[in-house]
Swiss-Prot record:
GO BP term (any one): citrulline biosynthetic process
Name under which the protein is recorded: Ornithine carbamoyltransferase
Subcellular location: Cytoplasm
UniProt-listed SUPFAM superfamilies: Aspartate/ornithine carbamoyltransferase
HAMAP family reported for this sequence: OTCase
Organism this protein belongs to: Salmonella typhimurium (strain LT2 / SGSC1412 / ATCC 700720)
CC annotations in GO: cytoplasm
Gene: argI
Family recorded in the similarity comment: Belongs to the aspartate/ornithine carbamoyltransferase superfamily. OTCase family.
Pathway where it operates: Amino-acid biosynthesis; L-arginine biosynthesis; L-arginine from L-ornithine and carbamoyl phosphate: step 1/3
Disulfide partners: none
Quaternary assembly: Homotrimer.
InterPro entries assigned: Asp/Orn_carbamoyltranf_P-bd, Asp/Orn_carbamoylTrfase, Asp/Orn_carbamoylTrfase_sf, Asp_carbamoyltransf_Asp/Orn-bd, Orn/put_carbamltrans, OTCase_ArgI
Length: 334
């Protein structure tokens, strides 16, 4: 696709609304072609570097399977398998990898790292997650929403994000709403709201596209009429333990449970989560949370909601691969 050819994919606001629509259409086509055994390989002979300073199941598998489906080869560089930022500057790493690879995925820390890779590598660079943004996740979310509300435009959909909205997911949701005109409600304590400047910028764009962005602490009004309720983990492995109690106390009331789902007044409301989710006591961290804070049966979402018919999280997870494939095909093939 000439519009995207050789361009980086760093954050959603680097693109127009029509470009975002084109990517979603390509993802839907690639998904259908794969399922119908009609996929055409566009990336034969391409070499792709996958830099992971932060581990991930979905992102790594999505990039690898998408690349293999399209005939490309991948090299995985984990946190212990590269010198990036330690013995070699990001700028130098970018220039080395750019001579060997046709595209580079980065999942890690600051947004400035992925931007430096894009500036100096000379090849398309894709943001698999940074501290500030998670654009590939939002592509998967938008495709999933389209699939579950066929025939509805985004500016006719209401998406609620409940929990900690000051993270990369909150930022990328704001950008998605700006481009698509979603009715986006960030339902969170004020301490967990995103930066005001980004909210203002995205709100103005969303309004022009027929949507609205609302920030509220009030759960009942915030979720009323929602088509989708979304949440993410409250604590991550590796965060200082002293932050856990503070975060849980702040967010406990914003757990997605059957009561919150009922408050929407929409019997067809769906549940989204970027995963992994602490919805039971079957993980190391989930067990710790249950034992230390009494969060049995789920932290940010209850097991009841996660395992219910309303949950479309595994459709969403599958769509990571199809949308990531669309990004690679769009940026690496003419």
């Amino acid at each position: 696709m000439s519009t995207f050819y050789q361009k980086p994919f760093l954050k959603l606001l680097d693109f127009t609304a029509s470009e975002l629509t084109a990517l979603l259409q390509l993802a839907a086509k690639l998904k259908a072609d794969k399922k119908n055994g009609k996929e055409e390989q566009k990336l034969v002979g391409k070499n792709i570097a996958l830099i992971f300073e932060k581990d991930s199941t979905r992102t790594r598998c999505s990039f690898e399977v998408a690349a293999y489906d399209q005939g490309a080869r991948v090299t995985y560089l984990g946190s212990s398998g590269s010198q990036i930022g330690h013995k070699e500057s990001i700028k130098d790493t970018a220039r080395v990898l750019g001579r060997m690879f046709d595209g580079i995925q980065y999942r890690g820390y600051g947004q400035e790292i992925v931007e430096t890779l894009a500036e100096y590598s000379g090849v398309p660079v894709w943001n698999g997650l940074t501290d500030e943004y998670h654009p590939t996740q939002l592509l998967a979310d938008l495709l999933t929403m389209q699939e579950h509300l066929p025939g509805k435009a985004f500016n006719e959909m209401t998406l609620v994000y409940a929990g900690d909205a000051r993270n990369n997911m909150g930022n990328s949701m704001l950008e998605a709403a700006a481009l698509t005109g979603l009715d986006l409600r960030l339902v969170a304590p004020k301490a967990c709201w995103p930066q005001a400047a980004l909210v203002a910028e995205c709100s103005a764009m969303a309004k022009k596209n027929g949507g609205a962005i609302t920030l509220t602490e009030d759960i009942a009004s915030g979720v009323k009429g929602a088509d989708f309720i979304y949440t993410d983990v409250w604590v991550s492995m590796g965060e200082p333990k002293e932050k856990w109690a503070e975060r849980i106390a702040l967010l406990r009331d914003y757990q997605v449970n059957s009561q919150m789902m009922a408050l929407t007044g929409n019997p067809q409301v769906k549940f989204l989560h970027c995963l992994p989710a602490f919805h039971d006591d079957e993980t190391t961290l989930g067990k710790k949370m249950a034992e230390e804070y009494g969060l049995h049966g789920g932290m940010e979402v209850t097991d009841e909601v996660f395992e219910s018919a309303a949950s479309i999280v595994f459709d969403e997870a599958e769509n990571r691969m199809h949308t990531i494939k669309a990004v690679m095909v769009a940026t690496l093939s003419k």
